[in-house]
Each structure stands twice: as structure tokens, then as C-alpha cells.
């Protein structure tokens, strides 16, 4: 019995080319889909990291601002500075500075906040009354900041762009010529224009 010659016929060159083309197309589609998934995952992780960075920054600012204390300090020139000075930047004296190592230092700390080169930066000094060689520790808290605004709520619930209205101490006749510190604001409002998250408005209540 003679075998059918058609039963042993292999693929033609054209069929092989078509199969290779289909395989290449499927491989390209699979690779493109995988690349898209990986790219989306990377964007998601970056967004999560930026959000965690903002949350950490909020907690740091809350800890600093809500623990402000009415303690003046002296700058590197020996001039007395108010417990809280606010405008486009913010400087304050805060309490509750943890000391787990038990070092011989105060639990009070001088803190500053400023907007510099699309970053919100925190400054901290290791001493309250500084010498001329006292340098602060500079800590960038977040990037991609387009603007930072500060406002201060006074005792009459009116918002002020600066605090206090004057940097001079208030002369109180009842204290027989002694100078009285201006009151601290009731709250500090921080507005941040962020490149990725838009406008963020945070309100911190100060101890009264």
C-alpha cells in the first residue's frame, strides 16, 4: 500500500514567515503590555512615596508649631528674638524636644521654616541663644513645591500676613516699664502649592 505523499508535507516558507510574523506581533504586544504595567506600577510607587513624604512633613510641622512656647532667644549678634516671628518664613521656639541620649541640653529648640528653590526647608538650632559660629541643621522636607504661604490668626479671629504686626515688644504701663511679649497667634495656616497634589492648606492650633 502506497503512503499518501501529502501526509508528510511540512510547512512552506510562506507559512513559516506568516507564523514568525504572528509570533513577533504577539511578543511585541506582550512586551508592550508588560512595559505599560511596570511603568504604571513605577508611577504609583512614586506617587505613594511623595504622599508619604507630605504626610511626614505635616506631622513634623504639627509637632513643631503646636508645641510653641513663649521663650525668647538671642541671635548670633546678641539681639533678642521673639518666641514666634512669621512672614514669608517662620521661626519659633518649641518645647518637647526629645532627649533619648540624656544629653545636657534644654528640651526647648529654635526652629525655622522657609521656601527655597522649590523645596520646603526646616532649620533647627542645637542651642537657643546662639553664638556667631552657630549653624543650623538644614533639612529639606519635600520637593516640587511651587509656593508656600503663611497666615496667622490673632485673638480677634482676623488673619494676619505677618506676626506680630511689629517686631518691637509691647510697652505695658501696668508692668511699671517692663516690656511684655506679644501674644502668640491662635493658629498658623500653611498653604502649599504642590506640583503633583495641587493646593494643600494645613491649619495648626497653638497652645493658649
Per-region residue spans from a language model:
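Extracytoplasmic beta-strand-rich oligomerization domains located immediately C-terminal to a leader/signal peptide
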Residues: 29-131
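Edge beta-strands of extracellular beta-sandwich domains
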Residues: 201-205
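Extracellular Ig-like/FN3 beta-sandwich strand-entry sites
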Residues: 185-187
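Conserved acidic
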Residues: 22, 53, 137
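Short, exposed beta-strand-loop hairpins at the edges of beta-sheets
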Residues: 189-195
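Intrinsically disordered, low-complexity regions enriched in Pro/Ser/Thr/Gly and acidic residues
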Residues: 95-183
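Acidic surface patches and DE-rich sequence motifs
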Residues: 75, 154, 194
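N-terminal single-pass transmembrane signal-anchor helix
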Residues: 2, 7-34
Amino acid at each position: 500500500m502506497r503512503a499518501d505523499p501529502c501526509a508528510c508535507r511540512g510547512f512552506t516558507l510562506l507559512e513559516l514567515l506568516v507564523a514568525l510574523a504572528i509570533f513577533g506581533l504577539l511578543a511585541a504586544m506582550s512586551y508592550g503590555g508588560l512595559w505599560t504595567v511596570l511603568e504604571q506600577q513605577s508611577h504609583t510607587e512614586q506617587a505613594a512615596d511623595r504622599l508619604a513624604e507630605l504626610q511626614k512633613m505635616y506631622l513634623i510641622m504639627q509637632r513643631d508649631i503646636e508645641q510653641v512656647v513663649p521663650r525668647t532667644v538671642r541671635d548670633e549678634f546678641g539681639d533678642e528674638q521673639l518666641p514666634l516671628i512669621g512672614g514669608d518664613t517662620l521661626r519659633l521656639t518649641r518645647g518637647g524636644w526629645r532627649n533619648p541620649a540624656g544629653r545636657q541640653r534644654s528640651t526647648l529648640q529654635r526652629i525655622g521654616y522657609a521656601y527655597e528653590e522649590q523645596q520646603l526647608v526646616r532649620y533647627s538650632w542645637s542651642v537657643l541663644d546662639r553664638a556667631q559660629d552657630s549653624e543650623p541643621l538644614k533639612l529639606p522636607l519635600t520637593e516640587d513645591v511651587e509656593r508656600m504661604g503663611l497666615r496667622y490668626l490673632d485673638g480677634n479671629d482676623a488673619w494676619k500676613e505677618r506676626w506680630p504686626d511689629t517686631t518691637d515688644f509691647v510697652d505695658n504701663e501696668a508692668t511699671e516699664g517692663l516690656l511684655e511679649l506679644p501674644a502668640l497667634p491662635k493658629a498658623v495656616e500653611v498653604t502649599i502649592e504642590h506640583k503633583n497634589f495641587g493646593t494643600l492648606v494645613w491649619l495648626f492650633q497653638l497652645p493658649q
